[in-house]
């Protein structure tokens, strides 16, 4: 019985440690400029990480103090949390699978088409009901102004692969419009305005830029997709470890109960 409880305590400690990368991934996502504006996807992972931390601590105390009730609560709650984490992972994978990016000849960065992203993201993140608020939030960030500090010449800008999807979509006009580069957020004399409806929406007003463009909406979704795919990799590894820990903990708990039953039987209590 003591050996089984000690094993369960160690496993709960491991589960508790697993909550750290989950919470850290959520905080990292929430700290990004785009996620600061998109409240819908902001905190689910953080909340799950904190709940796993609390439940794992409960299980650790239950195993350390030989409290079967706490262990039973731990096993029940952890099963629910692992299930919820799997739902979040599968959901995030499905809605971020479509990729609206495309390469532009002579450019180190990609550009983005809104049509290439999932319908769920388009309908729930960048729909007309939400975009006014998102646009104002993005305009208040340092996403576009910092480009003028990082890139001086056109060659530097055009060859860079470090420009984020959000910057590519919101801070400059689409390449097809044929605007001439002055600086990363100032473009003049377009040669092909009919190439894209966004060509007419571009403004050199630094509070406007291409925030009203479909390319900006696509860039925002491109950023979300890129960040969630990175976070998903960490979460997948963590959830595999959590499932492994949970299965062993269930087995140890069941064996401990069986040993306790046999011990009572031998003592004539049953």
Curated annotation (Swiss-Prot):
Question: Keyword set for this entry?
Answer: Membrane, Transmembrane, Transmembrane helix
Subcellular localization, per the record? Membrane
Q: Give the residue spans that cross the bilayer.
A: 9-29, 43-63, 75-95, 233-253
Q: Could you tell me the superkingdom of the organism this chain comes from? A: Eukaryota
Q: Cite the ranges annotated as topological domain Cytoplasmic.
A: 1-8, 64-74, 254-270
State the annotated membrane topology for this chain: Multi-pass membrane protein
Q: Which family does it belong to?
A: Belongs to the tetraspanin (TM4SF) family.
- What function does this protein fulfil? May be involved in the regulation of cell differentiation.
Protein name, UniProt field: Tetraspanin-2
Q: Which organism is it from?
A: Arabidopsis thaliana (Mouse-ear cress)
């Amino acid at each position: 019985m003591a050996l089984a409880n000690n094993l369960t305590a160690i496993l709960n400690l491991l589960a508790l440690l697993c909550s750290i990368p989950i919470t850290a991934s959520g905080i990292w996502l929430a700290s990004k400029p785009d996620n600061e504006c998109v409240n819908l996807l902001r905190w689910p992972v953080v909340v799950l990480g904190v709940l796993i931390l609390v439940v794992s601590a409960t299980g650790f105390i239950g195993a350390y103090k030989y409290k079967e009730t706490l262990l039973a609560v731990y096993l029940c709650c952890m099963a629910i949390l692992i299930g919820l984490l799997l739902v979040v992972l599968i959901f995030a994978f499905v809605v971020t699978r479509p990729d609206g990016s495309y390469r532009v000849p002579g450019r180190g960065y990609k550009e983005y088409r809104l049509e290439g992203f999932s319908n769920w993201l388009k309908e729930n993140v960048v729909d007309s009901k939400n975009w006014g608020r998102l646009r104002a939030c993005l305009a208040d960030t340092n996403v576009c102004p910092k480009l003028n500090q990082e890139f001086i010449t056109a060659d530097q800008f055009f060859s860079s692969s470090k420009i984020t999807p959000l910057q590519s979509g919101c801070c400059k006009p689409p390449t097809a419009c044929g605007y001439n580069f002055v600086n990363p957020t100032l473009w003049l004399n377009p040669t092909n305005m009919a190439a894209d409806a966004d060509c007419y929406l571009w403004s050199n007003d630094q509070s406007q830029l291409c925030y009203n463009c479909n390319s900006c909406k696509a860039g925002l979704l491109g950023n979300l997709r890129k960040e969630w795919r990175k976070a998903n990799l960490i979460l997948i590894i963590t959830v595999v470890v959590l499932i492994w820990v949970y299965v062993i903990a269930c087995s140890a708990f069941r064996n401990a109960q069986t040993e306790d039953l046999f011990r009572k039987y031998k003592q004539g209590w049953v």
